[in-house]
Regions:
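Sec-dependent N-terminal signal peptides
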Residues: 4-12
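Ser/Thr-rich, low-complexity intrinsically disordered terminal regions
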Residues: 16-127
Length: 127
């Protein structure tokens, strides 16, 4: 019985990556500042911003939400001309009324400011 349970645990770790159980995820820091932006915003009511950000991302051209799990959202944005994919992550920390945003290019040394513009646009829609 113990072996069967252990086999189940091992198999389930491959089927369900740890990010699929995300709740109150601490977003990783930006390693390459030239193509990554990470910010934290304090808000009064965490529920309203979550829905606003989700709706904004759903309506953004060439952007698709690939994961929503609890207080974590991951979207992919594809550039219009070169078809580069950037990752946009949002984590909500309800106990502290903090929203963490992280936008990073997957390739290249510089994003020519695209990620900062994306985060600034999101922020302008929020506040």
């Amino acid at each position: 019985m113990k072996i069967l349970f252990l086999a189940f645990l091992i198999c389930s770790s491959f089927l369900f990556p740890s990010s699929s159980f995300a709740s109150h995820v601490e977003l990783k820091p930006c390693v390459e500042i030239a193509h990554c932006v990470r910010e934290e915003w304090e808000v009064n009511n965490i529920e309203k911003p979550f829905e606003e950000i989700k709706t904004f991302i759903e309506n953004t051209p060439r952007t698709k939400i690939v994961e929503i799990d609890g207080d974590y959202l991951h979207a992919e944005t594809t550039s219009k001309w070169m078809k580069y994919v950037d990752d946009l992550e949002v984590s909500f920390l309800p106990e502290s009324n903090i929203i963490s945003i992280r936008s990073e290019s997957r390739v290249g040394e510089s994003d020519l400011g695209v990620n900062q513009k994306r985060v600034d646009l999101l922020k302008s829609k929020m506040f």
